[in-house]
Structures are given as C-alpha cells and as structure tokens.
C-alpha cells in the first residue's frame, strides 16, 4: 500500500467532463499512469464523466493532471476538477467498474 500521507507523495482525485467515454480515455489513463509510475484507479461514471485517483510523487501527479487536461487523442475535455485525496491508495493503477 502507498500512503498519500507520506511527505514525498500526494494523492489527487481527478474528475474529467467532456467527450471522455467511448474514446479509450480510461485505457489511455492507465497507460499514462504506468508511464509515470503512479498508483490509483480510473472509472467511468454514469453521468458520462471519468473519475480517477492518482498517487505518487507530487511532480508526477501534477504531470498526470496536465495530461488529463489535454485528454486522450480521441477525447474532448471540457472541464476538470481536482481535489486532495487523503488516506492510502493501493499499489498499481487499475480500471474500476462504472458507478
């Protein structure tokens, strides 16, 4: 387990709205997180948005947020909300079921 409360790590919840479902956004997010060495998860939401939690070194999490703002090649990001996520985030980065 990876604690976001460690001084060298942060965790952020990222909520992305726009054309982000049916355009490989989740798979792309998993690829980006793996490239950056982040822990967390991503899932579709019933309202058509995508939600993710990313945890790791601050500079890498901030880079993930920047990449989510740009979006995957086929997506269109209209807005993004980011907030701190306290607690423990499991190791690895996975896709979760839609909620």
Swiss-Prot record:
Gene Ontology molecular function terms on file: acylphosphatase activity
Active-site residues, Swiss-Prot/TrEMBL: 26, 44
Enzyme class: hydrolase
EC nos: 3.6.1.7
Gene3D superfamilies: 3.30.70.100
Catalytic activity annotation: an acyl phosphate + H2O = a carboxylate + phosphate + H(+)
Transmembrane segments: none
Keywords (A to Z) from UniProt: Hydrolase
Residue intervals of the Acylphosphatase-like domain: 11-97
Classification via NCBIfam families: PRK14421.1
Annotated family: Belongs to the acylphosphatase family.
This protein's name: Acylphosphatase
Species, as recorded: Rhizorhabdus wittichii (strain DSM 6014 / CCUG 31198 / JCM 15750 / NBRC 105917 / EY 4224 / RW1)
Gene: acyP
């Amino acid at each position: 387990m990876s604690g976001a409360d460690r001084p060298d790590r942060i965790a952020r919840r990222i909520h992305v709205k726009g054309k982000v479902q049916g355009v490989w956004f989740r798979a792309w997010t998993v690829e980006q997180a793996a490239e950056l060495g982040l822990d967390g998860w991503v899932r579709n939401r019933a309202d058509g948005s995508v939600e993710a939690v990313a945890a790791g070194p601050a500079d890498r999490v901030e880079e993930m947020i920047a990449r989510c703002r740009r979006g995957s090649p086929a997506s269109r990001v209209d807005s993004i909300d980011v907030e701190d996520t306290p607690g423990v985030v499991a190791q690895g980065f996975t896709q979760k079921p839609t909620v």
